[in-house]
Amino acid sequence: MAGLMGKYAAFLTRRPVLGNMISSAVLFGTGDVIAQQLIEKKGADHDLPRTARIVTWGGILFAPTVNLWFRTLERIPIRSRWPATFARVGLDQFGFAPVILSGFFTAMTFMEGKDFNAAKVKWHESFFPTLQANWMLFIPFQILNMGLVPLQYRLLAVNAVNIPWNAFLSLQNAKGRKAEEDPVAISKKE
């Protein structure tokens, strides 16, 4: 295991964006599989396009964006470790988290083949409960991550915590899809 981690660390040093893209894609996909198989118990009815969408989000959209964001946060000109950490976490959670979650719900809706109005509906239904859950998990986690973990490993640390978080995101995103596909659920809303 130590040899594998050493190779991964060397790869991250040589190709940080690509390494984080691959890690994020795998871990976002893992979260969706957990959501579908362990929580929703879909079995053979696994929604592969849903998994492909969340893998695409994690690997192609999320990872490069967060990689750049973490490097930007590192430039905050505060020399003392903990004041800099709290400044970074504040910017991350109250500035960046709302943007990236909005991007998630919008991108997932568009990848499902739906229009901007559908994205607005999904955002209104899912954004605030998801943001509150994000803050409960990621504010304490990011204090530790940004205060103690070297920059090149921060996205990997986030991705490790993201396995259960991605299962939650997948469920939040699918919740709106189920209502759209179930005429009984739609008629109950009216």
Curated annotation (Swiss-Prot):
Belongs to the peroxisomal membrane protein PXMP2/4 family. It is a multi-pass membrane protein. GO terms for biological process: ethanol metabolic process. The keyword Transmembrane applies. May be involved in cellular response to stress. Required to maintain mitochondrial DNA (mtDNA) integrity and stability. This is Protein SYM1. Coiled coil: none annotated. The chain crosses the membrane at residues 16-36, 54-74, 91-111, 131-151. It comes from Cryptococcus neoformans var. neoformans serotype D (strain JEC21 / ATCC MYA-565) (Filobasidiella neoformans). Keywords: Membrane, Mitochondrion, Mitochondrion inner membrane, Transmembrane, Transmembrane helix. It is found in: Mitochondrion inner membrane. GO terms for cellular component: cytoplasm; mitochondrial inner membrane; mitochondrion.
